[in-house]
Curated annotation (Swiss-Prot):
Main location: cytoplasm
Protein name: Enolase
Record carries keyword Metal-binding: yes
Superkingdom classification of source: Bacteria
Organism ancestry: Bacteria, Pseudomonadati, Pseudomonadota, Betaproteobacteria, Nitrosomonadales
CDD domains: enolase (cd03313)
Function: Catalyzes the reversible conversion of 2-phosphoglycerate (2-PG) into phosphoenolpyruvate (PEP). It is essential for the degradation of carbohydrates via glycolysis.
Gene3D superfamilies, per the entry: Enolase-like C-terminal domain, Enolase-like, N-terminal domain
Signal peptide interval: none
Cofactor(s) annotated in UniProt: Mg(2+)
Species this protein is from: Nitrosomonas eutropha (strain DSM 101675 / C91 / Nm57)
This protein's pathway: Carbohydrate degradation; glycolysis; pyruvate from D-glyceraldehyde 3-phosphate: step 4/5
Subcellular location(s) per record: Cytoplasm; Secreted; Cell surface
Length: 428
């Protein structure tokens, strides 16, 4: 009864008003799995390729009708009749059908939509919550959220070089209390911005996007917001920064426009280290460009014992690249973005490889999101311990937090909130 009898794709709209793809997978039993695919703004060069139409007369060339056609035609024909519970085999079939190194022929967006929809259908067929279907009986850890409070870089129309300034409520007793903490700090930050006559418009991921004179101003204001909301900076609420440094790395230097600086790798690492000394920063993402492996080595040697160093662009959720990084002792964490690699199986493999190497895995959204909540189930199903899914505003972000709250309720007394133990690779 779990045989696939129909696959249907359509073009829908993401949180930035751009087209993306959604797929339905129908099983013989009548069960339906539906999944939609996110899209990034800061896209690494190593990511699997999403297929866009290039027709400037529709959506400025960003349409996905070709990807939809590939699902409704070639992909549908290939997986019709297959058992939806055989996720690894189906994903392998999709990869081989595409035949390219980076899924550029059929489109990683087309392949991923089907891969995720298959898993959802199989979970429904098995009468299991999706997180339980993915992870089994030991799936009980609620992840610590990285909550975006201030947007910059390509995620906002302001002068900040850094892409995200986040809070990490690692000292709270439960996911529910962590979400409450995030909402309260977010509200307090709004008040502080109003007092400074700064705008409270939000960026792609729901964080505020004010025009600060320097990058560091964001950190000082976040610490103030944490304190005035009634929480302890550091012990209860830490800070994370996504530099997205590949975006301002040119000609071998890091160009910080808002600060008027042009820094070598060593100088930029000193710059970040000075922040770590002054503020309760526990996580830095893409602190060095994906092109600067030597710089990554220096950063890891300098801060890797006390700060989580998350590789996003450099690893691209790709086990081949992650293995290279592990062998060279680069970073100590990987950001997991399902659309960077293009199938559920490869996503789960990347999480497993990271854990086996003592790296942490942070399951992440993209700046262009949909109402799909599957990353919440992946985070719990794999016991990934950390999730990054935006601010406490915009329904496309809150959908994931609300799904985590439902999962916590479903787990009942078995549920455990990861808290500070989520950063197991760091020395106390």
């Amino acid at each position: 009864m779990s045989a696939i009898v129909d696959v249907i794709a359509r073009e829908i709209i993401d949180s930035r008003g751009n087209p993306t793809i959604e797929a339905d997978v129908l099983l013989e039993s009548g069960v339906l799995g539906r999944a939609s695919v996110p899209s990034g703004a800061s896209v690494g060069t190593r990511e699997a390729v999403e297929l866009r139409d290039g027709d400037t007369q529709r959506y400025y060339g960003k349409g996905v009708l070709k990807a939809v056609e590939n699902v409704n035609g070639e992909i549908s024909e290939e997986i019709m009749g297959l058992d939806a519970t055989e996720q690894c085999f189906i994903d392998k079939t999709l990869i081989e059908l595409d035949g390219s190194e980076n899924k550029s022929r059929l489109g990683a967006n087309a392949i991923l939509a089907v891969s995720l929809a298959v898993a959802k259908a199989a979970a429904e067929e098995s009468s299991l919550p999706l997180y339980r279907y993915l992870g089994g009986t030991n799936s009980k850890w609620l992840p610590v959220p990285m909550m975006n409070l201030i947007n910059g870089g390509v995620h906002a129309n302001n002068r900040l070089d850094m892409q995200e300034f986040m809070i990490i409520p690692l000292g709270l007793p439960s996911l529910r209390e962590a979400v409450r903490c995030g909402a309260e700090v977010f509200g307090k930050l709004r008040t502080l911005l109003h007092k400074k006559n700064l705008p409270t418009t939000v960026g792609d991921e729901g964080g505020f996007a004010p025009g600060f004179a320097h990058n560091e101003e964001a950190l000082g204001l976040i610490v103030q917001a944490i304190d005035e909301a009634g929480y302890q900076p550091g012990s209860e609420v830490a800070i994370g920064v996504d530099c997205a440094s590949s975006e301002f790395f040119r000609d071998g230097k890091y160009h910080l426009a808002v600060d008027g600086l042009s820094l070598t790798s060593a100088q930029f690492i000193d710059y970040l280290a000075s922040w770590v000394e002054k503020y309760p920063i526990i996580s830095i993402e893409d602190g060095i460009s994906e092109q600067d492996w030597d710089g990554w080595k220096l950063l890891t040697e300098r801060l890797g014992q006390t700060v989580q160093l998350v590789g996003d662009d450099i690893f691209a959720t790709n086990t081949k690249i992650l293995k290279k990084g592990i062998n060279r002792n680069i970073a100590n964490s990987i950001l997991i973005k399902i659309n960077q690699i293009g199938t559920l199986t490869e996503t789960l493999n990347a999480i497993e490889m990271a854990k086996c190497a003592g790296y942490t895995a942070v399951v992440s959204h993209r700046s262009g999101e949909t109402e799909d909540t599957m990353i919440a189930d992946i985070a719990v199903g794999t016991n990934a311990l950390q999730i990054k899914t935006g601010s406490l505003s915009r329904s496309d972000r809150l959908a994931k937090y609300n799904q985590l709250l439902r999962i916590e309720e479903d787990l009942g007394d078995v549920a455990q909130y990861a808290g500070r133990s989520a950063f197991y690779q760091l020395k106390p």
